[in-house]
Amino acid sequence: MVTLHGUACKLPDTELENLVKGIISEDDLKHAKVGLGDDAAVVIKNGMAIVKTIDVFTPIVDDPYLQGRIAACNSTSDVYAMGISEIIGGLVFLGIPPELPVPVAKKMLQGFQDFCRENDTTIIGGHTILNPWPLIGGSITGVGKEEDILTKAGCKNGDVLILTKPLGNQSAMALSRVTEEFEDLIDIPKEEQKYIFEKTIELMTTSNRIALLHLRELENELGEKIANAMTDVTGFGILGHSQEMAEQSDVEIEISCLPVIKGTPELASLFGHALCSGKGAETAGGLLISTKPEYKDKLIQKFKENNVYAFEVGKIVNNGVGIAKLSENVEILEI
């Protein structure tokens, strides 16, 4: 029904910049602590940080309940990527084809709401339209302390980058859409294909709130902030989102490791995806944390003790450059 699935349907970042250029001025954003260019907008009101974001996308799986969970995971992630763990509610946007049975749409909503409940929040309203193809997402509002806000702009020279989920779900989900007539082109045993699909669903429905809470737990134990900047890895790939961090922090980032779901490099090559060049689109990807080097081992240990993936994927190597690049001998680490 659709040709672009999940976060792969996002408008490319360069086109997005051109779209909003000249429309929203700096004066328009004078009351916003964080405006365009970050994971979410932040307004400070009476000492409280109000975090607003919206994410809507096309289906990435056939199962409507799972699609709802994935959409909720992806929509809420931008609030968590700003360092805020409390979401006060979400307004769900739903596009329904006229021929789509109501029970299918209800399953999408149920998946979205169940994910919200598991993360101590809820659907509080929304908007539904008739549309030629299904759409689901939401406008999410988080609240927290101003000092807890993390943006893409805080990277420091010498920082280490930690990623909390492996990459590759674009290629993994493309595998699930291969029809019987083309199955012979996939030189991966059925058991491995099953692993790829199940691991990908697990990752796309694992909330980034879990990693954020353990980051905050470690900071409380140490009595010090250890994350300088943070984002999540979604439609622009790890290199694209690292580039955003590099530009906003005015630093040079070098990505030395690409942790990927086992089997996805082969699939990416087959499907023409840019996974191994760091530009593969991710849906509901992990947090990318720029942390002080003296705390990286403690952070990795904290994550691993709590069943959160933790990969050291790169570092900040220079000031005043504003560019992200892959190492010449970048490691492809299959998980």
Curated annotation (Swiss-Prot):
Cofactor mode of binding and number, as noted: Binds 1 Mg(2+) ion per monomer.
Site (Important for catalytic activity): K10
Binding-site residues for Mg(2+), renumbered to this chain: D39, D78, D232
Keyword ATP-binding: yes
EC class (word): transferase
Superkingdom classification of source: Archaea
Cofactor: Mg(2+)
Entry annotation: catalytic residues: U7
GO terms (BP aspect): selenocysteine biosynthetic process
Alphabetical list of InterPro entries matching this protein: PurM-like_C_dom, PurM-like_C_sf, PurM-like_N, PurM-like_N_sf, SelD_I, SPS/SelD
Keyword entries, A-Z: ATP-binding, Kinase, Magnesium, Metal-binding, Nucleotide-binding, Selenium, Selenocysteine, Transferase
Enzyme Commission identifier(s): 2.7.9.3
Residues that, per the record, bind ATP: K10, L36, G37, D38, D55, D78, G126, H127, T128
GO molecular function term, any single one: magnesium ion binding
Tagged with keyword Nucleotide-binding: yes
CC annotations in GO: cytoplasm
Reactions catalysed according to its record: hydrogenselenide + ATP + H2O = selenophosphate + AMP + phosphate + 2 H(+)
Gene3D superfamilies: PurM-like C-terminal domain, PurM-like, N-terminal domain
Family statement drawn from the similarity comment of this UniProt entry: Belongs to the selenophosphate synthase 1 family. Class I subfamily.
HAMAP family: SelD
Protein's job: Synthesizes selenophosphate from selenide and ATP.
Self-association and partners: Homodimer.
UniProt protein name: Selenide, water dikinase
Lineage: Archaea, Methanobacteriati, Methanobacteriota, Methanomada group, Methanococci
Gene (UniProt): selD
